[in-house]
Amino acid sequence: MRIAMISMHTSPLEQAGTGDAGGMNVYIRNTAEQLAKLGLSVDIFTRATRPLQGEVVELGDGVRVINCVAGPYEGLSKEELPTQLAAFTGSVLAFTRQHGLSYDLIHSHYWLSGQVAWLLRDLWNIRWVHTPHTLAAVKNNYLSEGDHREPESRRICEQQIVDNADVLIVNTDAEVADVEEGYDSHKARIAVVTPGADIEKFTPGTERATENARRALGIPLSAKVIGFVGRLQRLKGPHVLLQAAATLIERYPDMPIRVLICGGPSGSGLERPKCLEELAEELGISRAVRFLKPRPPEELVSIYQAADVVAMPSANESFGLVALEAQATGTPVVATRIGGLQAAVAEGKSGLLVDGQDPQAWADALGQLLSDDDQRIAMAEYAPQHAARYSWENTAKQLVELYRSLPTMPEEGPAERHPAGSAN
């Protein structure tokens, strides 16, 4: 089976935690690689963002990234990308025509890609599944200071995708409810496929590994360390963590507390690193906070291992892959009781869930684990068992089962008028 994956606005080659690259990048790359291991062939079409990028990049046996030229390489924000939908679609069609390619199924990611896939599905006369990752109707319910509302045009485009895709793939049952409440949808056409973690790469560390990770970061071995990994946008709540940390430092004057924030700026609003550094300075905790640039997975392992607990004070998360990665390394997670985080964290066993983003409530939850070694250690021991339920291999198997359950398209249809790759 040959799959055309569409990821217009962000490439699986980009470093997660920077710009618009995040969990979706991790999701696409890992699922594509696992699908290939199951015998499928996957081409991932994305927009070229650098002039020296090769048109085709091999990710491994059976997986390619196709960099399609659509507009200038640099200088376009995600909000401006809808102006390049036609150009991107044309590049996809030109590539497939030039190389005589055909596919059995299209899997699009995010609403921009869904608009492209909608046209390609009719041109190629093949099945189309779509994973939204985020939804305008949900994001607009969780705006933070300085954030812009998602435009009505996006919500309209998402409704068109919901109406026309053969199957809409979501991460959790909670997301099924989001689609049903925010859009006119047919539940029978929504499938739940849970994401995963690279449980071979993210593994529990030994006591020595933790010591080495802390020494490399210049953190005292006796410190209580709170980790944060993700894009620095207010939706992710790094400001909430800093405010909670200030309360903890005042509450536990004899406890050496340190905060590690690993990630880069993204999105709109007051999320730039400088703003967070200024906030730490205003709170009087700048000496206890370290800001780290985004790191590849093999280096993220040591960040998780250096932490006693990982905090995810997000206003909303469709799932929260960081929670799985942290737990896979044996680090408990404190997360907001919202969206997919309610499934990603086993409350009371691998971590704690907090209602909302009140800094005092977050200080209480974090303080509970930092001050109770027995509870924290018990959660650290259980966390990898919980994360092991969510491997990328299992995700890929669910996807293959879904792909193969779809009936083939009738022979007479759009493909009769528009062969694959033709724009006639």
Swiss-Prot record:
It catalyses: 1D-myo-inositol 3-phosphate + UDP-N-acetyl-alpha-D-glucosamine = 1D-myo-inositol 2-acetamido-2-deoxy-alpha-D-glucopyranoside 3-phosphate + UDP + H(+). It is an enzyme of class 2 (transferase). Transmembrane segments: none annotated. GO terms for molecular function: acetylglucosaminyltransferase activity; D-inositol-3-phosphate glycosyltransferase activity; magnesium ion binding. Keywords: Glycosyltransferase, Magnesium, Metal-binding, Transferase. The keyword tRNA processing does not apply. InterPro entries: Glyco_trans_1, Glyco_trans_4-like_N, Mycothiol_biosynthesis_MshA. Its EC number is 2.4.1.250. The keyword Metal-binding applies. It holds the Pfam family Glyco_trans_4_4. 1D-myo-inositol 3-phosphate binds at residues 9, 20-25, 78, 110, 134, 154. GO terms for biological process: mycothiol biosynthetic process. UDP-N-acetyl-alpha-D-glucosamine binds at residues 23, 231, 236, 295, 317, 325. Mg(2+) binds at residues 304-305, 307, 331. It comes from the Bacteria. PANTHER family: D-INOSITOL 3-PHOSPHATE GLYCOSYLTRANSFERASE, GLYCOSYLTRANSFERASE. Homodimer. Belongs to the glycosyltransferase group 1 family. MshA subfamily. Catalyzes the transfer of a N-acetyl-glucosamine moiety to 1D-myo-inositol 3-phosphate to produce 1D-myo-inositol 2-acetamido-2-deoxy-glucopyranoside 3-phosphate in the mycothiol biosynthesis pathway. This is D-inositol 3-phosphate glycosyltransferase. It comes from Corynebacterium urealyticum (strain ATCC 43042 / DSM 7109).
